[in-house]
Amino acid sequence: MNVSANGSVYDALTKAIATLGETGLQVAAYHLGELVVDTWAGVADPETGRAVDGDTLFTVFSMSKGVTATITHRLVERGILAYDEPLATWWPAFAAHGKGGITVRHALSHRAGLPGFKGLAFADQPSLAATGRNLEEATPDWAPGASMAYHGMTFGTLLGRTIELATGKPFAQVLHEEVTGPANIPDLWCGIPADPSIHARVATLHPGN
């Protein structure tokens, strides 16, 4: 641990809470495989005052895109997926409404033409199967590969549902087999496990400023 760097980052976190309206923050940084910063500040649950600590779990949202892409690349290496094959190769129902030409490469590069869900609220996304059904009924906003736009909400379903169907396994299981198990990352999940001791460590989400 780099004591000086750790202290500087801690000071930055407390300043962000004091001046930027942040509630709870946690930072870990590695250099050449060595943990050099591991610090935190603020509260994990504003209602109870539960403080953030080194074991607090945070929802990572779009950081999961990198994990999903990593799984995709690993499956391509083994011939389970292929960059230039249509998603419909493994997910036939996805081909409806002109989506048969959308490939794994298009999905990885945000060029699938499906940057958002239509008629699906954030709270109505219980599973990849459910969000996948929404995309099955969708019509692309442009031809595959013709343009690029950040697929902020749909990236995970485009690739995650394809991964499920190509492997015959739930995405959470594939995540463990391909990433978290081999890399010994015990606290990264797709969906929080039912264990109450894990739920007790999760930071409470609340509307931002």
Language-model regions: role of each:
Residues 65:
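Short, conserved phosphate/pyrophosphate- and ester-handling motifs at nucleotide-, phospho-/glycolipid
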Residues 1-60, 80-82, 137:
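Short, conserved catalytic-motif segment at the N-terminal edge
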Residues 34, 45, 97-209:
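Short, surface-exposed loop or secondary-structure junction motifs
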Residues 60, 83-84, 91, 104, ...:
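Structural motif detector for alpha-helix initiation sites
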Residues 83-97, 183:
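Short, glycine/proline-biased beta-turn/loop segments that scaffold the active-site neighborhood
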